[in-house]
Amino acid sequence: MILCQDVAKLRELVANFKKENKSIGLVPTMGALHEGHASLINASAKENDITIVSVFVNPTQFGPNEDYEAYPRTLENDCIVAQNAGADVVFAPKNKDLYPNEDMTWVEVTGDITKVLCGRTRPIHFRGVTTVVSKLFNLSRADRAYFGLKDAQQTEVLRRMVDDLFFNVELRIMPIVREADGLAKSSRNTYLSPEERKSALILSKSLRLAKEAFTNGQRDVEAILNLVKDTIQSEKISQIDYVEMYKLPGLKPVGNKIEGRVLLALAVKFGTTRLIDNVILEDK
């Protein structure tokens, strides 16, 4: 496996892969790799000749007073995880490599899709995501790019960007990977105290109860949202940011009844750590 920390070097590697007609899979990450990331890398390795994993804590997607400085940076371990999962290249640029100028070009998806859910409290977040991912698409010339469904809003925003800007890349959205006790894998789980970690299990439990209610015929949006909120609030240290439902694709409003394919998403704080999770409710 090659560790590449230079834009020019990555371009040279990619040009050679393309000359050899090799298909390229891209797995964009912010590092602190865990089994969720490994599953994305593994999927890419199975479906492509070459897998490039980017490791970059992207400053432009963090707002003021968010956890940019505290975000775990573990490049040495990330390389081990990536290699074991089947990566061929780890691309770990510095900030100045991807953002060489103070005055810069932004790639921004507008409309409600970036204003609801996480966009409501993190207004600059998705602009940072789409800007850095568009740079990574251009540099990697990837045929396929791999993202986890845990960041469901992000995947919808990126789908819009790919469609609108005619990126010649296939988005592969992979299932949420969970701990044995149900907690969704996240690099931010490392921030949780033992008490917070135990309380955070209420997230997957609340979504499981919602899925059961839906499976048993409940289609009333308010009833399911209240079920999830009440379940989460049974954990005293939980602070709900949002529990909401939107139609898929495109995150459109749902109305009073669940019809078609719907995203039930939540964001909840335990102490200072904000966790997200979701489930898709769909009539089969």
Pin down the residues of each PLM region.
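Nucleotidyltransferase catalytic core that binds NTPs
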Residues: 2-237, 250, 280
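Phosphate/ribose-recognition catalytic cores of enzymes acting on nucleotide-derived substrates
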Residues: 227-284
